[in-house]
Regions:
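Residue-level signature of mid-helix packing/kink "hotspots" within the transmembrane helices
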Residues: 23, 51-59, 143-144, 259-267, ...
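Conserved MFS/SLC helix-loop-helix module at the cytosolic interface between two early adjacent transmembrane helices
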Residues: 56-92
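Helix-to-loop junctions at the C-terminal end of transmembrane segments
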Residues: 57-69, 265-277, 362-363
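Cytoplasmic helix-loop-helix junction between adjacent transmembrane helices
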Residues: 101-139
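A late C-terminal transmembrane helix in Major Facilitator Superfamily
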Residues: 333-364
Length: 394
């Protein structure tokens, strides 16, 4: 196995654990809501607060990662994530749940700016769409197994058992990833930046502004794709639990279909974008996502729900590698982490606001409201991309 494949496998496994362990939390909200008497607004505070912590942390982590050892930073994040999962076994109510999730979200902030940046550096000159597609697919695969098994295990073993199980998996992933990349070329682990001048705050802000100007058309897409993940994982189990007679295990299977389809789509992404092109892939993704968002707010029949989740899985997950590949092509390797840190911060900032509003509006009008929000905003992004069809995306 060559160095590039070792890096891709290691980063992919870290992504699988990172996204899988984080996906466990919202699936347990129906249990926590009853156990700790939580309101939808409190759930919105928990999810939005967690994203806010990630937003702040990713700016800092992204900025420092470009001159540091990527493998060490990623391993540190996974170990901290494992520790935070153990802390979650000690939940006593809303405040402790909020505190421990904030710690977990800080720990999960390491992967995306560093891991995606590492893949971007490694594959920038050779099949970047393939690299982004595979790392996205492995992250989705981790979340798929989490969604598929979480509610079932929680019913037979208890929710605390889940956190211990994922913590053990995380420690194992770190040991395996460190072993796998132990002998790879140092140049693939650390990118030296010959510019040793320390930036002033004004220079840092100017640099960030210039980076974001180059991808301004993609920014709404990043926000909606991130918000779609949060809304579906956080509020779909609550919607189905309230509006249907389905058991928690069946609800978990329905949600897992969504992400399982996403795994397949990401693996096929390179071929799809060759046929459609990245821009058309994004237009298709956001238009379909919008239609399915409206559909989720209306239909509760199990057959229709399954069809919706398949189409929503295709449309949601195909947008991530397309967006990241666009950004990778215009980003210099010495500022990969910094660039993805800025982008993911904006993505999570928008997602934080939308998740909080979703919780607040759900208390007022009903838990179907988040999917109306998703439908409207996804349609807006699709129309925006169509309107700019004759211009460069970046």
């Amino acid at each position: 196995m060559n160095d590039k494949k070792r890096i891709l496998l290691t980063v992919g496994l870290y992504h699988a654990f990172n996204d899988g362990s984080v996906a466990v939390i919202p699936l347990l909200f129906p249990i926590f809501k009853v156990l700790f008497d939580l309101s939808y607004t409190q759930i919105g505070v928990i999810t939005g607060g967690g994203l806010l912590i990630t937003l702040i942390a990713q700016i800092f982590i992204g900025r420092i990662s470009d001159k540091k050892n990527f493998r060490t930073l990623l391993s540190t994040g996974i170990l901290l994530l494992s520790i935070s999962l153990i802390l979650l076994t000690q939940i006593k109510g809303f405040l402790t749940l909020l505190l421990f999730i904030l710690i977990l979200r800080f720990s999960s902030s390491f992967y995306h700016p560093i891991g995606i940046g590492w893949i971007s550096r490694t594959f920038k000159k050779d099949r970047i769409d393939r690299g982004m597609g595979i790392q996205s697919a492995l992250g989705d695969l981790g979340a798929f197994f989490a969604i598929l098994t979480t509610l079932y295990i929680a019913e037979i073993k208890g929710w605390g058992f889940l956190f211990y199980l994922w913590a053990i998996i995380g420690i194992g992933v770190v040991f395996y990833g460190s072993f796998l990349t132990r002998n790879i070329n140092k140049e693939r682990i650390v990118i030296e930046n010959n510019d040793k001048t320390k930036q002033t705050l004004k220079e840092a802000i100017s640099e960030a502004t210039n980076i974001l100007k180059r991808i301004k058309l993609l920014i709404p897409g990043f926000v909606i794709s991130g918000a779609a993940w949060g809304i579906i994982v956080s509020y779909l189990p609550l919607l189905l639990d309230e509006k249907t007679t389905l058991s928690l295990s069946v609800i978990g299977i329905i949600v897992s279909i969504w992400i399982g389809i996403g795994v397949i789509v990401c693996l096929l992404y390179e071929k799809i974008q060759i046929i459609l092109g990245r821009r058309n892939t994004l237009i298709f993704g956001y238009f379909t996502m919008g239609v399915m968002g409206f559909a989720l707010s209306i239909f509760t029949d199990i057959t229709i729900l399954l069809l919706i989740m398949i189409l929503l899985g295709i449309s949601t997950f195909i947008t991530f590698p397309a967006l990241f590949s666009f950004v990778s092509e215009i980003t210099h390797e010495t500022v990969e982490g910094k660039t993805f840190g800025y982008i993911l911060t904006i993505q999570l900032g928008g997602g934080t606001i939308l998740l909080f509003l979703s919780g607040m509006f759900s208390d007022i009008w009903g838990v179907w409201i988040p999917f109306i929000i998703l439908g409207i905003l996804s349609m807006f992004v699709a129309l925006q991309l169509i309107g700019k069809r004759n211009k460069n995306v970046v």
